[in-house]
Amino acid sequence: MTVYGFHASHEQVPPADLLAAAVRAEEAGFGAAMCSDHFSPWSVRQGESGFAWSWLGAALQATDRIPFGVVNAPGQRYHPAIVAQAVGTLASMYPDRFWAALGSGEASNEHITGDRWPRKDVRNARLRECVDVIRALLRGEEVSHDGLVTVDRARLWSLPDTVPPLIGAACSEATAAWCADWADGLITVNAPHERLRRIVDAYRSAGGSGPLRLQVHLSWDPDPDTALAVAHDQWRTNVHGPPASWDLDTAELFDGVSEHVTPERVAEAVNVSADLGQHAAWLQEYADLGFDAVMLHHVGREQSAFIDAFGAEVLPRLDATPAGPARAEEAR
């Protein structure tokens, strides 16, 4: 069966409100939660970007049982040893309730260091070095490394009992296949079914193991016009695929290139409907593709009505299961 979780969008919701939403989601029956670690939003209209790591500590403490995950990009804005320390601390305090998905990053978050923004192949190579450093540190090893990142005699003094899962984040077949060599699972975002099948097949065919997670962007309101208007206002900057989504470096630039994006174009990237039955059907289709967890992101800034409606009317229609413990299958 599939876990249906809540995506906490730091780019759109103030941290205290987002914390209350995560608690509300658990109470409503969502089986998991996740967020992305961003320094800036995708649009000035979104208007927020709280610090994921401090929020995660509060969210794990405020909830009782659901696991949380974070999508993070080590290597530029974060030294991998700092990411390892953050992951290890949360996993130590909240065993079996935390996982981290690691990706190569986006310029909109990473440019703040003032360092050059590398090519995608270089970012992937840097990410792989970071993964190896993070995993070794979480196993209790002392690490020195000299490559695209430099580590000098780093050691974690506070360790979790078990190494939490390090998940690969991928939006393309090539990246999914590349992740298979090191990841404890895969997370991607909603796309046409055939493309999702290819991404999953690329990961599994390359030997990838562990659970498959899918983040689904959706917009719901009892009024269909409002549902579409909210999606267009909040998420039209997010219809652009790579390399634009990787390389644009400010919210203002995203707004500029999205000025003429139509509501109809947004509806190709966001599941928009006033019909809760339609949303349930869409989500079941994703589960039928083989995803073990489907993380729901309502793209509006107001989350309460969405959480309540989906908890009461959508989740009961789905073949859902509570999330199991967040554990890596084996040491790599």
Which residues fall in each region the model found?
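Active-site-adjacent structural elements that line small-molecule/cofactor binding pockets in enzymes
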Residues: 1-332
